[in-house]
Amino acid sequence: MKLPTETENVFSALRQSAKPKPVSAIEKLIEDAPDRELCRINALAFAARHGLDEDDVIGAFLHGARLGLFDMSWNILCPACGGILDSGATLKTVRQAEYRCVLCARGREPTLDEMVEVTFTISPRVRRIAAHDPGTLSWLEYYRQIFWSSGVDLPDDETFAKWVKETTLDSRELLPGE
């Protein structure tokens, strides 16, 4: 996919403030990756996968977020299942004394060192992905892209669907507010 001129201009600015290797890897990601890989990107995992310096990658993603390439989110995680209990644009959004996990049905007191991750999602102004409209995702894709954190290593689609079929007795999709 060829990036629009406006996005190319943002990458020109990013090249001025971040190291070239991470910027090139991010540009390739935005151009070539499927939608799912552009939702909740973990900078540390990205660095490891591409053999890049963690600090350089973190810097590139932070600068990219400031330039509007990514939306940065602070995710509160369930330590038991890895689900995202809450998400906000700043650390100040961690205000509750307890967060309840809908999957585990347990309350958790937030601890910043164990329950918070920072992720980056492509901005809809740069490239629109399915996760920008979570209400349109099937329940399976919703859990894969929205509910579980970047640290949950899920299998390929076929294996995942088979596993869900074998372990799920019934499912019902509810419209928002139901």
Model-based region annotation:
Residues 1-69:
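N-terminal alpha-helical interaction blocks
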Residues 38-43, 52-63, 76, 88-96, ...:
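Short, charged low-complexity intrinsically disordered segments located at boundaries
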Residues 66-135:
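Cys/His-rich short segments
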Residues 108-178:
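Long, charge-rich boundary regions
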Residues 32-35, 53-56, 71, 86, ...:
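Acidic-enriched, low-complexity/disordered segments with a strong bias for Aspartate over Glutamate
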